[in-house]
């Protein structure tokens, strides 16, 4: 049975009976065979029995939790079965060595900028202001300078959104709370992507807490933030363009009663359905010479980092080629 992501938008409870997980809510009880679960996204209020947690942990299922506003609040990250002392040591070495860390951070920023430019090109927009930020990368002597170049590129990138989007006005980036519908979708989509990246890291030898562009923190898996930078334009932003310009998401899918503008429950259902379809979408991989899903591209990026840390192959960032 092919494993898939489950998005639980409504409030409910997860229980276990034998080797099946059940999701119970006011609409009834829904069985979820354990061997069909890749990851769970809890977008509503969710309670879980200890027996359910035990089975999910045994099967290596990550559970990602979001608050009522759609913001990521944490993950249940099962005990790692692929842990490698050598890889963790090499990860730590590359973080502690300022030159090695700067090399990886620069690669993440370069990949993010090139992907933003590629997305603009696909949308028939001028990418020259975004590309101009690349010239600052080679001379950057610190993480702060690299993040400044990335921020400049992203600001230039965002100025094109109002030319791409037909039915909503973007203006500028705003967070917590989002000031308009587009910002609400960006924040929600980025949270989903961060969680998807974390799920892929779990299935590799990488330690999710050791990062290079973003500063490690006690309360976040910052390597997922590093890798997510590469995929935000390709997965989240292109999805938003598609949803808006095809009239799939409309003003009725948002709620302004909670302060700011947020996706309603129905809006979240639409978004996660299409987000998951985007993860499952396939492209022909140039090096592997076969079709791989967007979700698999994230895993492959993790493997590239493992190869870099173990001196098998120097890391180069994912850049959209199609």
UniProtKB/Swiss-Prot annotation:
GO molecular function annotation: DNA binding; DNA endonuclease activity; metal ion binding
Entries under Pfam families matching the protein: Cas_Cas1
Q: What top-level branch of life does the organism fall under? A: Archaea
Please, one GO biological process term? Answer: maintenance of CRISPR repeat elements
Where, in this chain's numbering, is Mn(2+) bound? 150, 214, 229
* CDD domains registered for this protein in UniProt: Cas1_I-B (cd09722)
- The parts of the chain that form a coiled coil are none
Which keywords belong to this entry? Antiviral defense, DNA-binding, Endonuclease, Hydrolase, Magnesium, Manganese, Metal-binding, Nuclease
Entry function: CRISPR (clustered regularly interspaced short palindromic repeat), is an adaptive immune system that provides protection against mobile genetic elements (viruses, transposable elements and conjugative plasmids). CRISPR clusters contain spacers, sequences complementary to antecedent mobile elements, and target invading nucleic acids. CRISPR clusters are transcribed and processed into CRISPR RNA (crRNA). Acts as a dsDNA endonuclease. Involved in the integration of spacer DNA into the CRISPR cassette.
The record describes its quaternary structure and partners as: Homodimer, forms a heterotetramer with a Cas2 homodimer.
* Similarity comment: Belongs to the CRISPR-associated endonuclease Cas1 family.
Report the protein name in the record: CRISPR-associated endonuclease Cas1 2
- Its gene is cas1-2
């Amino acid at each position: 049975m092919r494993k898939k992501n489950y998005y639980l938008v409504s409030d409910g409870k997860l229980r276990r009976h034998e080797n099946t997980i059940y999701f119970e809510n006011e609409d009834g009880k829904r069985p979820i065979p354990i061997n069909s679960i890749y990851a769970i996204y809890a977008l509503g209020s969710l309670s879980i029995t200890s027996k359910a947690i035990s089975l999910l942990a045994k099967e290596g299922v990550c559970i990602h939790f979001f608050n009522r506003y759609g913001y990521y609040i944490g993950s249940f990250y099962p005990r790692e079965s692929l842990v490698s002392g050598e890889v963790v040591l090499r990860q730590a070495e590359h973080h502690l060595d300022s030159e090695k860390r700067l090399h990886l951070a620069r690669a993440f920023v370069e990949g993010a900028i090139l992907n933003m430019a590629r997305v603009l090109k696909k949308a028939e927009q001028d990418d020259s202001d975004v590309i101009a930020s690349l010239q600052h990368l080679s001379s950057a002597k610190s993480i702060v300078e690299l993040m400044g170049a990335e921020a400049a590129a992203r600001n230039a990138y965002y100025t094109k959104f109002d030319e791409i989007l037909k039915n909503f006005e973007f203006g500028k980036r705003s967070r917590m709370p989002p000031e308009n519908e587009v910002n609400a979708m960006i924040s929600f989509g980025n949270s989903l992507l961060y969680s998807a990246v974390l799920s892929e890291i779990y299935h590799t030898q990488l330690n999710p807490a050791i990062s290079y562009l973003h500063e490690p923190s006690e309360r976040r898996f910052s390597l997922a933030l590093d890798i997510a930078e590469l995929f935000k334009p390709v997965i989240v932003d292109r999805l938003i363009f598609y949803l808006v310009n095809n009239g799939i998401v409309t003003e009725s899918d948002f709620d302004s009663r909670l302060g700011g503008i947020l996706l309603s429950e129905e809006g979240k259902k639409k978004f996660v359905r299409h987000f998951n379809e985007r993860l499952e979408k396939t492209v022909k991989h140039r090096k592997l010479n076969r079709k791989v899903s967007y979700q698999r591209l994230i895993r492959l990026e993790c493997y590239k980092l493992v190869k870099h840390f173990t001196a098998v192959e120097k890391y180069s960032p994912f850049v959209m080629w199609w």
